């Protein structure tokens, strides 16, 4: 196993019985066709369940709608990015030349709005969406390697130094949270999100995401430079439709 993966494994406090899962979790689609996006998809669901369980235990007096707000704060891209920075994850990521090398710098500049000011010349290693997605992929990899209990334990370790309180709820009321609260107040199931298209170069993709409410027969779409942002855009479009129809 590569030294950077050994260091990451030690920080995760999980020894993989299948090292290939760790390898894939740290491989971006710009590097190989055997990339981490399916693990990210799985890890996203495991993360939400584990965080929901954590909040259910810690904030026992909080009602459902407010729990959803706190959870949204904890699992949003910026929060996951900050958690990922505490791990040697950026060093272990395998990225294509367009992200890790000095080539195609002009192409990268076209996505400059997605980079943080201190990321110039970093080759995308500290790009928030890449690191946040990779962290979700790691959670998915641990789940496949050792089951839900191990993945849940990892999530608990990741959040052990994060202050979790009802005060977090105001910062998290984004479009997805607002839509989920609207549905919950009407005793309806959460919306369904699905990536329906991904276009553009690997280092500068655009995700088209569909947001559906089967009970109402409604579907709206949104596009952005990451899956999470695409979901927010789709949720915002759905909220606009609900408002326009006076629902």
From Swiss-Prot:
Residues 5-147 form the RNase III domain. Its EC number is 3.1.26.3. Residues 104-124 are annotated as: Disordered. Coiled coil: none annotated. Its cofactor is Mg(2+). Mg(2+) binds at residues 40, 133, 136. Pfam families: dsrm, Ribonucleas_3_3. Its main location: cytoplasm. Digests double-stranded RNA. Involved in the processing of primary rRNA transcript to yield the immediate precursors to the large and small rRNAs (23S and 16S). Processes some mRNAs, and tRNAs when they are encoded in the rRNA operon. Processes pre-crRNA and tracrRNA of type II CRISPR loci if present in the organism. This is Ribonuclease 3.
């Amino acid at each position: 196993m590569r030294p950077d993966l050994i260091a990451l494994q030690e920080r995760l406090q999980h020894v993989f019985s299948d090292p290939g899962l760790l390898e894939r979790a740290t491989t971006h689609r710009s590097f190989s066709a055997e990339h981490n996006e399916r693990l990210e998809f799985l890890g996203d669901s495991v993360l939400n369940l584990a965080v929901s369980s954590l909040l259910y235990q810690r904030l026992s007096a909080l009602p459902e709608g407010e729990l959803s707000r706190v959870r949204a704060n904890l699992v949003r891209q910026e929060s996951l990015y900050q958690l990922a920075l505490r791990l040697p994850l950026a060093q272990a990521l395998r990225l294509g030349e367009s992200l890790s090398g000095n080539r195609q710098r002009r192409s990268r500049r076209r996505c400059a709005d997605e980079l943080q000011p201190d990321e110039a010349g970093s080759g995308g290693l500290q790009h928030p969406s890449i690191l946040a997605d990779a962290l979700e992929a790691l959670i998915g990899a641990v789940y496949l390697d050792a089951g839900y209990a191990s993945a849940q334990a990892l999530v608990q370790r990741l959040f052990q130094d994060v202050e979790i309180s009802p005060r977090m709820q105001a910062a998290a009321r984004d479009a997805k949270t607002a839509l989920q609260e609207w549905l919950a107040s009407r005793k309806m199931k959460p919306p369904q999100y699905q990536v329906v298209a991904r276009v553009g170069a690997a280092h500068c993709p655009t995700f088209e995401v569909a947001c559906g409410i089967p009970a109402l027969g409604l579907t709206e779409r949104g596009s952005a430079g990451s899956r999470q942002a695409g979901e927010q855009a789709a949720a915002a479009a759905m909220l606009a439709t609900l408002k326009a129809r006076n629902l």
